[in-house]
């Protein structure tokens, strides 16, 4: 109430992947927001397996305009390793239900999970393109200190970033984890190529044009035309 009434805040980001875990809890919050009729623009996070079709109408009426989903991988085998138990049909069905309710979806995808191969990463890109979410984040699997992947990387003696910038997804020094089948450079190259394939897709750009307008399409086309400079990929090119 204070943010809206005293400061005129309209846009809010709820950084909690468990926000919709307890349906009774989230519906209670939505009811209070609906009563206030603040006309908010809310971005919230959710696990795919916690989104229930019965809550979508309330979420939309409460002002939630975006749900960011951790889809992670297009390979069921790799998803199982990441403890994501839904199959592809479940994922497609949930995303379509959210979009049908008038809520935009930001899909989060990871390339380079421990069991990933070039084929499974391609499956991830294929799923992302099939879903055609209003936005997509493409990440490389990273051994962030304190995470389970970091513990695994140390135990296996895998190379880790030598400086903090190496943990930054978009930095020149970015060094993701290698997989059981691919080098870190191969993972990073696939991720960067996948980003440009997705955001340059005519089907995606046409959807953006219809949904957000020509100005947003131009902005995304400009973004997709730029390539990130990567130390690992320069080393890969030199080796070839």
Identify the residue ranges that each predicted region occupies.
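A general, composition-driven signal for non-globular sequence regions
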Residues: 7, 41, 185, 219-225
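Active-site groove signature of glycoside hydrolases
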Residues: 4-15
């Amino acid at each position: 109430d204070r943010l809206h009434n005293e400061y005129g805040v309209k846009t809010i980001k709820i950084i909690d992947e468990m926000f919709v875990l307890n349906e009774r809890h989230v519906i209670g919050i939505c009811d209070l927001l609906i009563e206030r009729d603040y006309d908010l623009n809310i971005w919230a996070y959710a696990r795919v397996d916690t989104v229930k079709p019965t809550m979508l109408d309330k979420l939309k009426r409460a002002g939630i305009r975006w749900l960011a989903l951790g889809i992670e991988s297009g390979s069921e085998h790799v998803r199982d390793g990441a403890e994501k138990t839904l199959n592809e049909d479940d994922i497609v069905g949930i995303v379509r239900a959210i979009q049908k309710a008038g809520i935009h979806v930001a899909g989060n995808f990871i390339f380079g999970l421990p069991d990933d191969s070039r084929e499974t990463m391609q499956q991830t890109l294929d799923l992302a393109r099939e879903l055609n979410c209003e936005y997509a984040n493409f990440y490389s699997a990273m051994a962030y200190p304190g995470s389970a992947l970091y513990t695994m990387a140390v135990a296996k003696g895998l190379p880790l970033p030598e400086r903090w910038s190496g943990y930054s997804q978009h930095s020149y020094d970015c060094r993701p984890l290698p997989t059981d089948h691919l080098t870190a450079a191969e993972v990073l190259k696939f991720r960067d190529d996948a980003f440009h394939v997705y955001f340059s897709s005519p089907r995606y750009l046409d959807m953006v044009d219809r949904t957000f307008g020509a100005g947003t399409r131009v902005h995304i086309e400009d973004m997709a035309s730029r390539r990130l400079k990567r130390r690992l990929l320069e080393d890969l090119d030199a080796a070839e």
